[in-house]
């Protein structure tokens, strides 16, 4: 009997707790509704500020939207409201809308002291939309472009080191994507396409720490392509491999991979000799 009473007591307490939470939620909704219905715009602005400071960004956003028309003639107040409104979107993770709002802020308040910050945050919003390397990198490319514009526009900014780091990070992501695409061609046996893709990768990222690896993959790709070609084309394609090997030696004389490149040079040279000898034998 005692256990039954304990169960009833806990059930009652749980019910009270749920009821209290529901009441608080309804109260919050009613409170926001009352604020929006008010004709006291200074009060509305204070409440929006309170929501913003306490990180209730959805509510702050709604109130800011409501008071925009009233404060448009008060330049200083309107700038402050627009600034915080843009950050509401950013802080809610709505980076696409935030980027547009940061850009719009700069266009609306071109002489604002916050323009530099907004310019950076616009570029940073593109960066926040940048996906993993396997996916479409449109936003990554936009992040690089807008960060570079920021650096050029604000050469004395304290944010430039961070901007450069972001550009480097985004370029590294593009490099990974291009490498995986080139490697996929190679793994699928599409060796000519792989050679072209690895060459493009090397041209796009000549300062990469893996540049010698990419060049070796160019050599490997064209070597395999030559081996699979019809006999009439093999000499010319092995000659291309030799040219790539010589470029490797010129560009990466200290590379630990130079031995492999020289081995492909030797193999290609020998293959050309064999092909030439066979042609001599078959010539009447």
Regions found by a protein language model. Give the residues of each.
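Acidic, polar-rich low-complexity tracts and alpha-helical solenoid repeat scaffolds
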Residues: 16-284
């Amino acid at each position: 009997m005692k256990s039954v009473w304990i169960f009833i007591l806990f059930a009652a307490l749980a019910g009270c707790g749920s009821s209290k939470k529901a009441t608080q939620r309804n109260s919050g909704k009613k409170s926001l509704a009352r604020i929006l219905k008010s004709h006291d715009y200074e009060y509305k602005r204070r409440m929006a500020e309170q929501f913003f400071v306490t990180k209730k960004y959805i509510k702050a956003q709604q109130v800011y939207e409501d008071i925009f028309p009233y404060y448009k003639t008060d330049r200083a107040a309107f700038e402050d409201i627009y600034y915080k409104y843009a950050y509401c979107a950013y802080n809610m993770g709505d980076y696409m809308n935030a980027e547009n709002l940061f850009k719009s802020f700069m266009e609306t308040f071109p002489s604002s002291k916050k323009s530099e910050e907004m310019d950076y945050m616009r570029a940073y919003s593109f960066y926040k939309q940048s996906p993993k390397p396997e996916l479409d990198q449109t936003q990554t490319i936009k992040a690089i472009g807008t960060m570079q514009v920021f650096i050029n526009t604000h050469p004395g900014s304290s944010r430039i080191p961070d901007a450069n780091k972001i550009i480097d990070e985004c370029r590294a992501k593009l490099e990974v994507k291009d490498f995986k695409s080139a490697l996929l061609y190679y793994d699928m046996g599409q060796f000519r396409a792989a050679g072209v893709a690895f060459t493009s990768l090397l041209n796009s990222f000549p300062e990469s720490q893996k540049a010698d690896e990419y060049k070796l993959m160019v050599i490997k790709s064209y070597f395999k392509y030559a081996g699979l070609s019809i006999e009439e084309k093999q000499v010319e394609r092995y000659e291309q491999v030799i040219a790539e090997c010589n470029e490797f030696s010129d560009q990466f004389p200290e590379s630990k991979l130079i031995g492999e490149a020289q081995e492909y040079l030797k193999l290609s040279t020998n293959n050309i000799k064999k092909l030439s000898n066979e042609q001599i034998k078959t010539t009447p």
